[in-house]
């Protein structure tokens, strides 16, 4: 039989909640909602397998609930603590105390069949971790045990054995100490100590300690300590400590600490700490901390912290923190934080934060934050934030933010934001935003935005936006927008828009739009639009539109439209439309339309349409249509159509048709059709159609269509279509389409499409599309697309796309894409992409991508990517990537990556990575990585890594790493590492390490380590270490170590060690050690030791005070013994150097 279930023991709080807040059932299934199969305590249910193991996770509280649950063995995961297991789900089979749970598990261990289930179809296999399993009486439980247990070991077997039968208390021997004076009543359980004055009443549980004055009443659970003065009443659960002066009343749950002055009342749940002065009343839930001076009243939920000065009142929900000075009153919901100085009154909902100076009043809903100086009053709904300096008064609805200077008053509805300087008054409805400097007064309805300078007054209805400079006065209805500079006065109805310069006066009805320069006066009825430059006076009825230049005077009835240049005078009845150039005079009845260029004089009846060129005079009745050229005089009645030839004056009303010959001047209202001959000037209103021969001048309103011959000039409003012949000039508004032949000049508004022939000049607004022929000049706004043939000049705004032919010059804003032909010059802003053929010059901003052909020059900002053809010159900022063919010159900032072909010159900042072909010249800052081909010259700063082909020259700073192939020359600073191929020359500073191939020459500072191939020549300073192959030459200073192969020449200073192979020559100074192979020659000075192979010559150079003399010895058959170290003794005899304690042998 296979056991597939086990029993697990755990504890919960008295309410059946575990440490994670999960409420366990009294019986039935319990499951973790966030199960994770890991060997950690979180994300699962845990307990002691079969009730044996560490006691660290069992509750020590007397009212803890001991739970036994049944768990499938396959679900169990062992944890690191002895006996602890983790599982996703369980079946609760028993709930009781420690003894009953222990008896339950012990009984089931004796009868394992009660917790196992047999199956005839399959056998359940436990998880890979070892799970102890209960066995019959002959089996024992095996638990993982730590080497050193950090907690007591709990075992249900020992508990059951020591306990009485189930449902009985353990047997203990009563040990009580009771001391009382007369008139007292004492009752204590086991191990209790009761001491009381006369007339007292004390009742204690196990292990309690009660001390009371006369007339006191004390009741405590087991393990408690109570001390009180006379006439006090103390009641506490087990494990509590209570201390009270006379006349106090303390009540607390288990594990609490209460300290009270005289005549105080303390009530707290379990685990609380209360400290109070005399005449205080403290009430708190479990786990709370309360501290109060005398005369204070504190009430808080569980887990709260309250600190109060003298005569203060604090009320807070659970988990709150309250701190107050004397004479303060604080009230807060759960989870709140309140801090107040003396004399303050704070009231807040749950989760709020309140900080107040002295004598302040704060009231806020839940989740609010309030901060105030002294003598301030703040009131806010839930979720609000209020900050005020001293002497301020703030009132706001829920979710609002208020910030005020000294002595300010802010009132706002919910969700509002208010910011003000000192001495300001702000009032706003809900969802509003107000910002004001000192001395300002703002009043706005809900959803409004108000911004004011110093000493300004703003009044607006709901949903309005007001912005003003200092000393301004703005008044607007709801949904209005007003913007004014200093010293201005604006008054508008609801839904209006007003913009004014300094010292201006604007008055408008609701739904109006007013824009003026400085020192202007605008008056309009509701629904009007007025635009004026400085020094103008505009007056209109409701629903009117007026536009005026500087120093103009416009007067119109309601529903009128007036447009005038500077120094113009316009008078019209209601519903009229007037458009005039500067210094014009227009007079019309109601419902009329007048259009005139500068210097014209127009008079028309109501419902008429008059269109005139400059210097013309038109008079027409109502409903007329007039069209005339400049310097013409056209007069027409209502509903008329006028057509004039060159140099004519035509005046027509709306919807008219005018036809004029060459050199004519035609003016027409909206929707007109005009046809003129050679050298004509045509002017038309919105939606007009104009056709003219060569050298004509055409002006059209929005949505017009214009067609002109050779050398024409066309001007059109928004959405116009213009077609012109050779050498034409076209001007169009937004969304226009223009088509012109060669040598044309085109100007368009936003979203326009322009097509021009050879040598054309095009200018366009945002989002335009321009196409031009050879040698064209194109200028476009943001998001434009330009296409031009060779030798074109293109200028575009942000996000533009430019395509140009051979030898073109392109300039673009941010994020542009430019493509140009051969020998082009491209300039672009940040994030641009440029593509050009050979011999191009490209300049880009940060983060740009540039691609150029042969022999190009590229300049880019930070983080750019550049790719260029043969013989290119590239310059880039930090973090750039450059790629060029051989023969190129590259310059890059810090952290750049440059790749170039043969014969290139690369210069980079710190931390750069340079890669180049043969015959290249590379220069880099500190920490750079350089890789070059044959015959390259590399120069780098400190800490650089250089790699080059053969015959290269490398120069590096301190701590550099250089690698070069055959025939290279390397120069490095101190502490460098150099590696070179055959026939290389290396020069390094002190302490350097050099490695070279065959026939290399190495020069290093003192203390260097040199390693070279055969026939190498090594030169180093003092304290050096040199190693070389056969046929090498080594030269070093004092205290050096030299090693070489056969047929080598070694020269060293004093105190050196020289070792070489056969047929070598070794020369050293005093006190040196020389060792060589056969057929070698060794020369040493005083104190030196020489050792050589067969047929070698040993020469000792000695100084006798006047001259040098030599002692010579030869090794071999007729000489001294080979491979023995020899030196010159005090008698100037050559002797072999003995080992310690050996006799020395004189050599004759």
Curated annotation (Swiss-Prot):
GO molecular function annotations of the record: ice binding
Superkingdom, taxonomy of origin: Bacteria
Chain intervals with Polar residues compositional bias: 230-250
An annotated GO cellular component: cell outer membrane
Region annotation (Octapeptide periodicity) ranges: 180-1099
Subcellular location: Cell outer membrane
Keyword annotations: Cell outer membrane, Ice nucleation, Membrane, Repeat
InterPro entries: Ice_nucleatn
Region spans: Disordered: 110-131, 222-256, 367-394
Biased composition regions of type Low complexity, renumbered to the chain: 114-128
Topology with respect to the bilayer: Peripheral membrane protein
Function per UniProt: Ice nucleation proteins enable bacteria to nucleate crystallization in supercooled water.
Family in the record: Belongs to the bacterial ice nucleation protein family.
Swiss-Prot/TrEMBL domain comment: Contains many imperfect repeats of a consensus octapeptide A-G-Y-G-S-T-L-T; further on a 16-residue and a regional 48-residue periodicity is superimposed.
PANTHER family hit by this protein: KERATIN-ASSOCIATED PROTEIN 21-1-RELATED, PTHR31294
Identification of the protein by name: Ice nucleation protein
Native source species: Pseudomonas syringae
């Amino acid at each position: 039989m296979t056991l597939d279930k086990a029993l697990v023991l755990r504890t919960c709080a008295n309410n059946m909640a575990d440490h994670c807040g999960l409420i366990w059932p009294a019986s039935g299934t319990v499951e973790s909602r966030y199960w994770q199969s890991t060997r950690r305590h979180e994300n699962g249910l845990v307990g002691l397998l079969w009730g044996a193991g560490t006691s660290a996770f069992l509750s020590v509280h007397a009212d803890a609930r001991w739970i036994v649950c049944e768990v499938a063995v396959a679900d169990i995961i062992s944890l690191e603590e002895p006996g602890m297991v983790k599982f996703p789900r369980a079946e609760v089979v028993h709930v009781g105390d420690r003894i009953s749970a222990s008896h339950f598990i012990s009984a089931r261990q004796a009868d394992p069949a009660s917790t196992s289930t047999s199956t005839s179809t399959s056998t359940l296999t436990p998880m890979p971790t070892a799970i102890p399993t209960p066995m019959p009486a002959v089996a024992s439980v095996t638990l993982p045990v730590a080497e050193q247990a950090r907690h007591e070991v709990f075992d249900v077997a020992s508990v059951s054995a020591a306990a009485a039968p189930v449902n009985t208390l353990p047997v203990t021997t009563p040990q009580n100490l009771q001391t009382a004076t007369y008139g007292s009543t004492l009752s204590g359980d086991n191990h209790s100590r009761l001491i009381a004055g006369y007339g007292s009443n004390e009742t204690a549980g196990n292990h309690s300690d009660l001390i009371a004055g006369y007339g006191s009443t004390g009741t405590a659970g087991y393990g408690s300590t109570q001390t009180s003065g006379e006439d006090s009443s103390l009641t506490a659960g087990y494990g509590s400590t209570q201390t009270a002066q006379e006349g106090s009343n303390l009540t607390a749950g288990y594990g609490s600490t209460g300290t009270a002055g005289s005549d105080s009342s303390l009530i707290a749940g379990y685990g609380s700490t209360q400290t109070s002065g005399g005449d205080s009343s403290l009430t708190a839930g479990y786990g709370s901390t309360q501290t109060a001076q005398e005369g204070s009243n504190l009430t808080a939920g569980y887990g709260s912290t309250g600190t109060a000065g003298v005569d203060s009142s604090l009320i807070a929900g659970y988990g709150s923190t309250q701190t107050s000075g004397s004479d303060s009153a604080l009230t807060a919901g759960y989870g709140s934080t309140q801090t107040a100085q003396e004399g303050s009154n704070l009231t807040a909902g749950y989760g709020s934060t309140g900080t107040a100076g002295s004598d302040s009043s704060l009231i806020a809903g839940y989740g609010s934050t309030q901060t105030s100086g002294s003598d301030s009053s703040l009131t806010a709904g839930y979720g609000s934030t209020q900050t005020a300096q001293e002497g301020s008064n703030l009132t706001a609805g829920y979710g609002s933010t208020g910030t005020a200077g000294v002595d300010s008053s802010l009132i706002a509805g919910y969700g509002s934001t208010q910011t003000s300087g000192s001495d300001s008054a702000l009032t706003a409805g809900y969802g509003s935003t107000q910002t004001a400097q000192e001395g300002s007064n703002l009043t706005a309805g809900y959803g409004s935005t108000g911004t004011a300078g110093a000493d300004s007054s703003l009044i607006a209805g709901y949903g309005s936006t007001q912005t003003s400079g200092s000393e301004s006065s703005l008044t607007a209805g709801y949904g209005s927008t007003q913007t004014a500079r200093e010293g201005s006065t604006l008054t508008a109805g609801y839904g209006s828009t007003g913009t004014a310069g300094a010292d201006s006066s604007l008055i408008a009805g609701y739904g109006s739009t007013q824009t003026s320069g400085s020192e202007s006066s605008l008056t309009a009825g509701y629904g009007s639009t007025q635009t004026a430059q400085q020094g103008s006076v505009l007056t209109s009825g409701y629903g009117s539109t007026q536009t005026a230049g500087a120093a103009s005077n416009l007067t119109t009835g309601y529903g009128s439209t007036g447009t005038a240049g500077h120094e113009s005078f316009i008078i019209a009845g209601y519903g009229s439309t007037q458009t005039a150039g500067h210094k014009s005079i227009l007079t019309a009845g109601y419902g009329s339309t007048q259009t005139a260029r500068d210097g014209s004089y127009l008079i028309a009846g109501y419902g008429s349409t008059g269109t005139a060129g400059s210097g013309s005079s038109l008079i027409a009745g109502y409903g007329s249509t007039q069209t005339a050229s400049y310097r013409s005089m056209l007069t027409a009645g209502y509903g008329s159509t006028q057509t004039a030839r060159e140099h004519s004056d035509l005046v027509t009303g709306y919807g008219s048709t005018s036809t004029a010959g060459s050199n004519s001047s035609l003016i027409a209202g909206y929707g007109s059709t005009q046809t003129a001959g050679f050298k004509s000037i045509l002017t038309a209103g919105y939606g007009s159609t104009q056709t003219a021969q060569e050298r004509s001048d055409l002006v059209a309103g929005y949505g017009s269509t214009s067609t002109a011959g050779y050398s024409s000039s066309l001007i059109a409003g928004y959405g116009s279509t213009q077609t012109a012949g050779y050498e034409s000039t076209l001007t169009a508004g937004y969304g226009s389409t223009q088509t012109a032949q060669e040598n044309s000049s085109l100007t368009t508004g936003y979203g326009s499409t322009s097509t021009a022939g050879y040598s054309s000049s095009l200018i366009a607004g945002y989002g335009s599309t321009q196409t031009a022929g050879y040698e064209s000049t194109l200028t476009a706004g943001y998001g434009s697309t330009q296409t031009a043939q060779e030798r074109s000049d293109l200028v575009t705004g942000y996000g533009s796309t430019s395509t140009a032919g051979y030898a073109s010059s392109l300039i673009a804003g941010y994020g542009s894409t430019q493509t140009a032909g051969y020998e082009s010059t491209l300039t672009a802003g940040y994030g641009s992409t440029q593509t050009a053929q050979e011999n191009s010059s490209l300049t880009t901003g940060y983060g740009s991508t540039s691609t150029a052909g042969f022999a190009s020059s590229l300049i880019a900002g930070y983080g750019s990517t550049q790719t260029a053809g043969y013989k290119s010159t590239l310059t880039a900022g930090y973090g750039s990537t450059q790629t060029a063919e051989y023969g190129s010159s590259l310059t890059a900032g810090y952290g750049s990556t440059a790749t170039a072909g043969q014969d290139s010159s690369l210069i980079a900042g710190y931390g750069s990575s340079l890669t180049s072909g043969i015959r290249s010249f590379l220069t880099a800052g500190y920490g750079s990585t350089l890789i070059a081909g044959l015959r390259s010259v590399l120069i780098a700063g400190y800490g650089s890594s250089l790699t080059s082909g053969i015959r290269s020259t490398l120069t590096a700073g301190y701590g550099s790493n250089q690698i070069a192939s055959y025939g290279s020359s390397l120069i490095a600073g101190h502490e460098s590492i150099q590696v070179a191929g055959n026939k290389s020359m290396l020069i390094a500073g002190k302490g350097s390490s050099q490695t070279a191939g065959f026939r290399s020459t190495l020069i290093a500072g003192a203390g260097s380590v040199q390693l070279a191939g055969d026939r190498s020549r090594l030169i180093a300073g003092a304290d050096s270490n040199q190693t070389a192959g056969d046929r090498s030459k080594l030269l070093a200073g004092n205290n050096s170590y030299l090693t070489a192969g056969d047929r080598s020449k070694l020269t060293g200073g004093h105190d050196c060690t020289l070792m070489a192979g056969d047929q070598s020559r070794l020369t050293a100074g005093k006190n040196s050690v020389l060792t060589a192979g056969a057929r070698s020659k060794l020369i040493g000075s005083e104190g030196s030791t020489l050792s050589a192979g067969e047929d070698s010559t040993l020469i000792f150079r000695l100084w006798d005070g006047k001259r040098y003399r030599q002692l010579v010895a030869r090794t071999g058959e007729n000489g001294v013994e080979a491979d023995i170290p020899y030196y010159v003794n005090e008698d100037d005899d050559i002797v072999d150097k003995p080992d310690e304690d050996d006799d020395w042998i004189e050599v004759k």
